[in-house]
Design a protein with these regions (language model features):
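A short glycine-rich, hydrophobically flanked beta-strand micro-motif that places a catalytic Asp/Glu
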Residues: 46-55, 90-91
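Rossmann-like S-adenosyl-L-methionine
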Residues: 69-289
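Short acidic-glycine loop/turn motifs at beta-strand connectors
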Residues: 1-3, 10-12, 56-58, 95-97, ...
């Protein structure tokens, strides 16, 4: 079977093989030959595999979807690859299968003084440097808040560091990231302020104005933005928001909704964490006029 470590060109589904990639972390780049072996071992001609690879302090965390079904023959081959690569964790989700993990060491990430084992393939910021810049901006905007609402909280990128100085309510559409967040909060030392969590689809069930009573709101929606939630925030008495966005177009739409109800942008931070691409991350400080 021929395999490719590849990109797709703009506006195309064509696979273009690559020998190198200047934006990959060195540990991931060094693992490319072994990842190719992984695809050969578990891929099929009829299917498409997706690999999510994260560098952690314990080693690489590799999550695979779309390969062959896990069985007694495949498991030892995958375990041997994880051993050779000294990967922290390898998670395999075949067709119609929940992910099965080979965990050699917990793939721990640091969010402030908390340590979190994220769910396999879960959403994370692209780089530690970008994450640090985003967190610094969010901390600056929310400084002095005694209670913070974190919307689209993921596994705690902002919630856990902010809980060092404030109570936090974290809302996320999936339970697995919140489970990881809660475990990290419980184990943090020194202890954090109180963190509560809520599983809620904010696109379908945005928080209503009478639920938006915290001193500050942090919101980090997906690329599609948070139009439904923005409408509810606009109708609330919310005074301070840190709005994180990876899409200027949807951010402009949502910011207009807020502006029409008396909220305005005080400052905006631009963070170029997607090198050699047109994508940009922004953090806006939004306050009620």
């Amino acid at each position: 079977m021929k395999t490719a470590r590849a990109f797709t060109p703009a506006a195309s589904d064509m696979i273009v093989d690559i020998a190198d990639c200047m934006v990959l972390r060195q540990a991931i780049l060094a693992a490319l030959p072994l990842l190719r072996e992984l695809v050969v071992a578990g891929g099929t001609r009829a299917g498409e595999m997706a690999l999510t690879v994260t560098e952690t302090g314990a080693g690489l965390d590799v999550a695979v979807t779309g390969g062959k079904p896990m069985d007694a023959a495949l498991l030892p081959r995958l375990a041997a690859l994880a051993e050779r690569g000294d990967w922290a964790r390898l998670t395999w989700a075949g067709p119609d299968q929940d992910g099965q993990s080979i965990t050699r060491r917990p793939p721990v990430l640091g969010f402030g003084r908390a340590r979190v084992v994220p769910p396999p393939g879960g959403f994370l910021q692209a780089t530690p440097e970008g994450q640090a810049a985003l967190l610094a901006a969010v901390r600056d905007i929310t400084r002095g808040a005694r209670s913070v609402l974190d919307l689209f909280a993921g596994c705690g990128t902002f919630s856990l560091p902010l809980a060092e100085t404030a109570r936090v309510h974290a809302v996320e559409g999936l339970s697995a990231p919140l489970d990881a967040l809660a475990a990290g909060a419980r184990a943090a030392s020194p202890p954090l302020h109180r963190i509560t969590t809520e599983v809620r689809d904010l696109a379908r069930r945005p928080l209503l104005p009478d639920e938006l009573t915290h001193d500050a709101i942090v919101i980090d929606p997906p690329r599609a933005g948070a139009e439904a939630q923005a409408r509810q925030i606009a109708l609330s008495r919310a005074e301070t928001l840190a709005w994180v966005s990876c899409d200027p177009v949807t951010f402009a739409r949502d910011a207009r909704i807020l502006a029409d109800q008396g909220l305005s942008i005080s400052r905006i931070y631009v963070i170029d964490q997607f090198r050699w691409s047109p994508h940009v991350e922004t953090v806006a400080e939004i306050r009620r006029r």
